Amino acid sequence: MIDSPRVCIQVQSVYVESQSIPEEERYVFAYTITIRNLGRFNVQLLGRYWLITNSNGRQTEVQGEGVVGEQPLIPPGGEFQYTSGAILETPLGTMEGHYEMVDHQGQPFQTAIPVFRLAIPTLIH
């Protein structure tokens, strides 16, 4: 878990075996992110940046507006949770990045998304 001055990010990831096709180098993962506003004022998530790295070292950058079609306004003490997914060519990889956010005065800031592992269960010891 990593804390910015106002926001805490928590991540959980799982392998989605039913949608994966290992013989075609298709490994599907889902991740659930909880964004908590620990501050005294509203914050809003406007965009995201991801760096996805597979176990061969291949990196993919993803940028976009909001998350899952939303730009949530998170009140003080509140949280926003969503689930999304990633497809890798390898059974192991990582994701990390940041959210582009604004505070209650419209001032932009970034909140780091801690690096987390994407791995099929048989690779986790």
Curated annotation (Swiss-Prot):
Residues 1-125 form the ApaG domain. SUPFAM superfamilies: ApaG-like. Transmembrane segments: none annotated. InterPro entries: ApaG_domain, ApaG_sf, Uncharacterised_ApaG. GO terms for biological process: error-free translesion synthesis. HAMAP family: ApaG. This is Protein ApaG. It comes from Serratia proteamaculans (strain 568). The gene is apaG.
